[in-house]
Amino acid sequence: MTRKIPDDNPISAKKFMEELRRYEKGSVSRRHFLGVTGLGAATAVMAGAMPMLAGSRKAFAGSIGDRVSIATWPNYYNPENFEQFTKDTGAKVQISVFGSNEEMLAKLQAGGTGWDVFVPTNYTISTYVELDLIQPLDVSRLPNFNEKYLIKRFIEPGTVNGKLYAVPKNWGTTGFVLNRKKIKSNPTSWREFWDLTKTDASGRVMVHDYQLTTIGNALKYFEYSFNSVDPKELADAEKLLIDSKPHLFAINSDYQPSMRSTDAWMSIAWTGDGLQLNRDIPEIDYVLGKEGGELWSDFYAIPKSAKRLDAAYAFINFLIDPVVSAKEVEVHGYPVPDDRVTALLPKEMTENPIMYPAKELLDALEFGAAITLTDPLRAEVMARFKSA
């Protein structure tokens, strides 16, 4: 399915593409293009994809410091974009990779991360606000942020108590990947995923080192809510996890290397990893369990402890530029809730069912709930599972 810009927006996706092509061919002036598309304030970051704007990007050079630090997820960025940002500004991008929101929360609470930008998931932002670990954003410093083009359901969690704390990065789903050359059956459910873990795929299965998804999808075996904190339901999920533990290859949120080497044949997975693996190794498929699971959206945000604010704002604004963001998507395969970006993506991506699942599959999914991030019972279940 292809996302379309609503009719009440100032420019449609089709019109945006028409104007972009006209501008690239030199048929219209720079002023005309920027005015018609509403990207006039974004010239500083558009220049990487449009050399005609290059002069304005150089204004950043030397003015934001020598580095910017981002905490993000595995396989979730385009290195060429980071290199371009360094080339344009002189600020080197330092990357910290984490595998769960619990890990990110713990590091921020401990202090001293040195992060300027981090990538929280939708359900965690209200907790960061409550704990005073995140700072509200000054929208005037993010000219590429334009709500008119954004899909509402994926951006709402970024606003808490009327203040904007985070701007959308990507959205996606949590399902599982499997190597169809190794697994001959055709699983379509979480029940089949966990049953295969203990039978035909024993010793070849990975689950996330992340309680939300690993516990959540164990809960789906029993058709409980992905977000359940009910003691009896969590006890059922814990028994399933501990019974499955001897049959696992690994507990790790970075599962691509093992899937590529065929050390693992099946793993809990996110949209973009599923697309990357399927693109490179067609026998690896991505499946959304029919019982449901997780729908999520990730954001760019600035920690309360950030010291390099000029670099943080410049970096976020660069990354949410439609052209830069499209380059991100083409590499990692996670959709963006920004219709300006979708308009720039190739048809083979906008019509790919891994990126844009069928409505009936999406309708069965749940957004993560804030309570799961700090619920002690879920934390205890995950700890006992990992130590079993």
Question: Each PLM stretch: what is its role?
Answer:
Residues 298, 303-362:
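Mature extracytoplasmic/periplasmic domains
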Residues 60-127:
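Early extracytoplasmic/lumenal segment of secretory-pathway proteins
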Residues 9-12, 16, 257, 359-388:
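Conserved C-terminal helix/tail region of periplasmic/extracytoplasmic solute-binding proteins
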Residues 135-146, 166, 282-294, 303-306:
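Short beta-strand->loop
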Residues 126-171, 185-191:
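Hinge/lid segment of periplasmic solute-binding proteins
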Residues 206-210, 214-218, 222-289:
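Ligand-binding pocket segment of bilobal, Venus flytrap-like solute-binding proteins
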Residues 25-26, 32-56:
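N-terminal export signals
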Residues 1-32, 55-57:
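N-terminal secretory signal peptides
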